[in-house]
Amino acid sequence: MARVAVQLTNFTGGELSPRLDGRNDLTKYSSGCKTLENLIVYPHGAAARRPGTSFVAEVADSDNKTRLIPFEFSTTQTYMLEFSNLKIRVYKDNGSVLEGDKVISGITKANPAVVTATSHGYSNGDEVVITEVVGMTELNGKRFLVAGVTTNTFQLTDKDGTNINSTSFTTYGSAGVSNKVFEITTPYTTAQLFDIKFAQSADVMYITHPSHEVAKLSRTAHTTWSLDEVEFTNGPFLDHNITTTTLNPSHKSVGQTTTVTASATTGINGGSGFVATDVGRLVHVKDGHFQITSITSTTIVVGTVIIDLGINSATTTDFALGAFSDTSGHPSCVTFFEQRLVFAG
């Protein structure tokens, strides 16, 4: 009896449950597998072995969790963001994004090795990559932490803080370049990394976390990035006041500093009145709103008028507190929907 090799040309069914063994009456059976390991299934049906991986760099802190988030401007401009405790590092083209060259003019044979680079601008703890050194080539292509910083020199240590002993290295000849690993300072701690949500449009990524103000990560050049708090200038606001509490602003026009006095704490933060965490919060009053800049008491705040308040009388009950603040919390989710930026949570 002839033996027939069955051709399998479609794997879009993926891995099938053991309960489907022998269920050739199901449409998915002919496009499924019992096990698909180290394979990638393409939308057209074919399956291919997954690509390999390579070691690019050690993360900033290997002892704690790190989160990787893609930053995709286009098919040719894609970055990987490494979020760790209070910082972001950026990767592109199989390597870390580095700051500009600092020219090396000398390296000692000592313990620790001391590098001379005029006006390098480094701080203790910075991570640098050294390349193009003639003579003491043992340092080329390696990463070090900076220590013992002076204006024109710095010592080399490894990631654990152990001094780099260069006494047995080849004598420094000439040249060499030092580049600091590019980093962005953030407010996000290790414990908060996996609660971050994000949405990207072109070169801007919006980042939310319930404990922090909405942030905007912007890229203007390969090594020019900024992380700034988003300034909301027109809301959103909570429900309007329905109590008899009134607000009496001293000034009402755009740009003016105003002292606002409440007749009571009722209707303000659940009856607690104004609190320290309200600094930076918007308050809608009549036709406009102001932003709180300081707290005098539970019934008195100082702020800057953003939009004319439009009050004819001295006081009004028509006010609403901003929805986003350190008091009420910040949005935990963000996305784009029909070309609009949407927050939730």
Role assignments for model-derived ranges:
Residues M1-G100, H212-T257, S313-G345:
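N-terminal beta-propeller domains
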Residues A2-D25, G95-Q200, H209-P210, F232-K252, ...:
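Small/polar beta-strand repeat architecture
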Residues V260:
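Post-transcriptional modification and biogenesis factors for structured RNAs
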